[in-house]
Amino acid sequence: METSIACYSRGILPPSVSSQRSSTLVSPPSYSTSSSFKRLKSSSIFGDSLRLAPKSQLKATKAKSNGASTVTKCEIGQSLEEFLAQATPDKGLRTLLMCMGEALRTIAFKVRTASCGGTACVNSFGDEQLAVDMLADKLLFEALQYSHVCKYACSEEVPELQDMGGPVEGGFSVAFDPLDGSSIVDTNFTVGTIFGVWPGDKLTGITGGDQVAAAMGIYGPRTTYVLAVKGFPGTHEFLLLDEGKWQHVKETTEIAEGKMFSPGNLRATFDNSEYSKLIDYYVKEKYTLRYTGGMVPDVNQIIVKEKGIFTNVTSPTAKAKLRLLFEVAPLGLLIENAGGFSSDGHKSVLDKTIINLDDRTQVAYGSKNEIIRFEETLYGTSRLKNVPIGVTA
């Protein structure tokens, strides 16, 4: 028998929201639960309840050891539900990732049908007309609230902790960039959503390595949901089918060497001679330039093509813009779970402690040799020099 997930479909009031406030903790965005439920249902492309696949339909690949069955590998063609049943035993995490998947498919539709004028791209959210990035923000907060497993959440648009009403013990905290690249929606470039999931009730004093999952929603010619679950090998791509379901279409476990580069913040080459030298190397060695100005597609291509490097370097006059919590750390987990490497110039971005919600950093993602070149060119040495491929430093 199918079991409904507590996400959008039940209309049950979430646990009471704390009224306590601090400088970093505020109450959630003011939603009327019943009306927001209706708005979300009407905003969805399909409006169907999410369902867990019957156990009899799960296609787990198993290996027997001492009489016990252990899932060792997922299968291409699985549904998102089937994959998550293998990827993690945590029902709460499965519910959260399913709810976020529902929000992503709705955002994809809203981005695709947005009206773009001279200053913004807008679409409807119930009776409101909102810029698509704010609409995405609201949808994601609602998804987390209705998951009933999210304690705190914050976003680039609302960079303060929002109490989602979930439990501390066994619950999660989520940070997200609702629509990375929103300024290029009107040009019809690919844009996307980024989010990271941490256990418990903290989004500061933690590292990217503490994440239990991270994901991107990618809205381009295809709509995909790319996710990584800590402890489960690979980074996995799900395609949104016409009937509104997510189907597993790709597993990436290795980022190989290949001449493809995506250089962000090139204005930093003006007064960062080392970065200028690195860019000159790519040009001299005839690397293929693949850069859109959207971080989601520029990093996603490394996972899909299984090669290349993305850089966003700072200088005295071109300061860091990328946020560690909302963008850099989640993408770091996606890249490293896929067999790649990340760096701030000295160490993996997953090893950087998030002190403030707005912490920013430079970053590079790519294959091992590309990250070695990045670190050596900018700082003269690399921690990865003697690290075997497949081992995270």
UniProtKB/Swiss-Prot annotation:
Broad class of where this protein is predominantly found: plastid
CDD domains assigned to the protein according to its UniProt record, in alphabetical order: FBPase
E.C. designation(s): 3.1.3.37
Pfam families: FBPase, FBPase_C
Catalytic activity: D-sedoheptulose 1,7-bisphosphate + H2O = D-sedoheptulose 7-phosphate + phosphate
Disulfide-linked positions: 116-121
Tissue: Expressed in all tissues examined except root. Highest levels found in leaves and flowers.
UniProt superkingdom: Eukaryota
Positions of Mg(2+) 3 binding: 177, 180, 327
Residues that hold Mg(2+) 1 according to the record: 127, 156
Broad class of enzyme this protein falls into: hydrolase
Subunit structure: Homodimer.
Similarity-based family: Belongs to the FBPase class 1 family.
Record-given protein name: Sedoheptulose-1,7-bisphosphatase, chloroplastic
